[in-house]
């Protein structure tokens, strides 16, 4: 049968001839000079039915069967060789020529080591708090990686190994997060992280409220006692256009550094961070109290609770006459330290001698060196007055330390003046003016100069002399203040012992600040946009919430460890992935001892208690009270 006896074959020959003519025409026309300076483009549509007329370019192979056949042949040959080698290795192993380790090594194409540590525990906690779901709900994106996923990675990094944004991708690639999230480490580059910070910034208040409320409800946190304090985080750089990074005063921070301030409320139950607000570094501590009181009152009213069910504990920088009236206006109870600044306050602080305090111990142990006596203080501002219950506390250890330090400084000053007197008559110390100048320099450099009276004079024989003595009256007046401080409250039902014990617990919020600056490394700040600084501060606050919440839950299970100690205990855990030549993979954990197994079981029990608590639409059941300190009710959320 003639293979060209079909219409398709005839058409194929016709197509070949057509293309030959086109090619010949192109060669002919290329040697002829164009007769017009411009040519108009020819517009048209070429239609070709491949199924009916055949291929438009018949010299191209429609099916690359040769390449496919070669590929299949090579795969078959490789599999055949591998099977032969496997059989040969098996025979050698059975004969004892090869060890099992050599066989396993031959069957292993590669091995990968992923850092795991405390990642499963912390990731499960964040999933229990629904951090990823809440952020994705408010910050939608069409990207393959949601903003909630990126935020969770940032939070985990702050908890385990705080790094700059540009190093996050490398860190993810070394951990088991790649397998857990099913995403490549390159997805978490610094540009994507910055976009996430920009995306969550408009929703920071809403996101924090919902995440924080998840923790309060699922862990049943007691909100009857709230601690409030302010801290500062140092920033590096110029920040010329920043509204937050400013110069200002803050304790234990250098005055020549720009800083960002944070006002934080923390629960006495577990020291969990609650409501917070970041402010300019130039903001004074007392200026933050008014807005904080408004935020607290608004939140409590929104949840249907009376403000007087909670008591706010603050340090002495958080109280003056105006603030005392604001507490009264909002109906909030408070217990705060007070710096004696008025004549009435100083008179109350020094009213009793040390001997008169010894009959009024306020510590839990009667032998403890803490004493207190009560009184009243009236605060007046803008024509309004409020009277508060006051407690003068004498801390014996603090008093003894202050007096011991003062005596050491007096002894050092006495030695300096004696050394100066021994050099009188030497060059530059031959006139009363020069000697007095040297005395003044030493007094100015000493912190106890107010207790020493020094005199330079000429003797009857015409010799220079220097004498000094301790001002016993000034020293006795100063010792009257040693180890003493004032506490004031508008809760008249609390005893002196309850006031003292509750105020000593206020270091809970200071522990939050310590964790933020040491473990989470919030400071120093390197971001230069206020929006990203605020968003990164939110990431750190969620990390702090997870840190303190996990610590509270495991300690309630009887595991007396901090979260940092737990992370260090789990640090050696790793995931080993073995890849075989046939494409199969084997995942296994590094060996776990019995003690670590027991720890993980307690941690799992702690997380299970929260996992099964469902947060309803109303979030908080009303009327949930139990006894707390004294007669004050305990509020459970």
Across the structure, where does each feature detected by a protein language model lie?
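Intrinsically disordered, low-complexity regions enriched in Ser/Pro/Gly/Gln/His and often acidic
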Residues: 9-12, 46, 58-61, 69, ...
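Conserved glycine(s) in the ABC-transporter nucleotide-binding domain "signature"
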Residues: 5, 29-30, 35-148
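N-terminal regions of proteins, emphasizing targeting and processing segments when present
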Residues: 17-25, 31-33, 603, 607, ...
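Intrinsic disorder/low-structure terminal segments
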Residues: 8-9, 19, 56, 72, ...
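Anion-binding and metal-coordination hotspots
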Residues: 90-94, 102-121, 129-637
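Leucine-biased recognition of intrinsically disordered, low-complexity hydrophobic segments
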Residues: 11-17, 23-24, 624, 629, ...
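Low-acidity, Ser/Thr- and Arg-rich intrinsically disordered low-complexity segments
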Residues: 2-12, 16-19, 25-31, 37-38
């Amino acid at each position: 049968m003639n293979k060209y006896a079909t219409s398709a074959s005839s058409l194929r020959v016709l197509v070949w001839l057509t293309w030959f003519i086109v090619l010949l025409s192109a060669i002919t026309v290329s040697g002829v000079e164009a007769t017009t300076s411009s040519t108009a483009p020819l517009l048209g549509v070429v239609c070709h039915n491949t199924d009916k007329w055949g291929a438009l370019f018949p010299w191209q192979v429609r099916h690359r069967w040769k390449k496919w056949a070669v590929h299949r042949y090579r795969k078959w040959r490789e599999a055949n060789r591998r099977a032969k080698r496997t059989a040969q290795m098996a025979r050698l192993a059975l004969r004892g020529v090869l060890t099992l380790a050599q066989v396993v090594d031959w069957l292993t194409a590669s091995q990968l080591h992923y850092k795991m540590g405390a990642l499963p525990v912390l990731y499960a906690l964040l999933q229990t708090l629904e951090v990823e779901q809440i952020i994705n709900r408010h910050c939608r994106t069409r990207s393959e990686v949601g903003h909630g996923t990126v935020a969770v990675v940032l939070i985990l990094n702050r908890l385990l190994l705080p790094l700059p944004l540009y190093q996050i991708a490398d860190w993810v690639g070394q951990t088991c997060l790649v397998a857990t999230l099913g995403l490549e480490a390159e997805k978490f580059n610094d540009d994507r992280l910055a976009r996430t910070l920009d995306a969550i910034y408009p929703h920071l208040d809403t996101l924090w409220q919902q995440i924080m409320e998840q923790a309060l409800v699922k862990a049943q946190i007691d909100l009857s006692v709230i601690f409030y304090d302010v801290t500062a985080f140092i920033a590096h750089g110029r920040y010329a256009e920043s509204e937050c990074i400013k110069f200002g005063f803050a304790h234990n921070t250098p005055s020549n550094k720009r800083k960002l301030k944070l006002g934080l409320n923390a629960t006495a139950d577990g020291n969990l961070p609650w409501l917070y607000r970041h402010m300019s570094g130039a903001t004074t501590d007392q200026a933050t109290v008014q807005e904080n009181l408004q935020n607290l009152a608004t939140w409590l009213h929104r949840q249907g609770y009376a403000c007087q069910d909670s008591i706010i504990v603050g340090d002495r920088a958080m109280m003056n006459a105006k603030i005392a009236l604001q507490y009264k206006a909002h109906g909030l109870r408070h217990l705060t330290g007070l710096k004696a600044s008025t004549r009435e306050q100083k008179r109350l602080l020094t009213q009793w001698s040390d001997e008169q305090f010894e009959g009024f111990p306020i510590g839990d142990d009667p032998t403890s060196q803490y004493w207190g006596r009560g009184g009243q203080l009236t605060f007046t501002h803008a024509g309004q007055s409020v009277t508060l219950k006051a407690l003068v506390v004498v801390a014996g250890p603090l008093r003894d330390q202050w007096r011991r330090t003062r005596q050491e400084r007096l002894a050092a000053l006495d030695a300096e003046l004696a050394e100066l007197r021994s050099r009188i008559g030497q060059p530059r110390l031959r006139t009363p003016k020069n000697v007095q100048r040297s005395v003044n320099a030493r007094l100015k450099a000493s912190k106890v100069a107010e207790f020493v009276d020094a005199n330079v004079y000429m003797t009857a024989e015409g010799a220079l002399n220097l004498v000094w003595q301790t001002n016993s009256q000034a020293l006795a007046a100063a010792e009257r203040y040693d180890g003493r401080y004032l506490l004031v409250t508008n809760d008249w039902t609390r005893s002196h012992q309850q006031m003292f014990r509750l105020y000593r617990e206020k270091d809970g919020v200071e522990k939050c600040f310590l964790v933020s600056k040491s473990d989470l490394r919030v400071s120093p700040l390197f971001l230069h946009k206020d929006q990203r600084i605020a968003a990164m501060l939110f990431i750190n606050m969620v990390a702090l919430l997870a840190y303190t919440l996990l610590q509270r839950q495991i300690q309630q299970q009887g595991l007396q460890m901090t979260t940092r100690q737990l992370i260090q205990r789990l640090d050696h855990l790793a995931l080993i992935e073995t890849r075989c030549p046939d494409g199969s993979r084997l995942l296994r954990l590094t060996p776990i001892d019995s003690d670590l197994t027991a720890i993980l079981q307690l941690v799992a029990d702690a997380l299970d208690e929260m996992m099964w608590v469902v947060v309803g639409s109303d979030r908080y059941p009303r009327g949930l009270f139990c006894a707390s300190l004294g007669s004050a009710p305990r509020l459970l959320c």
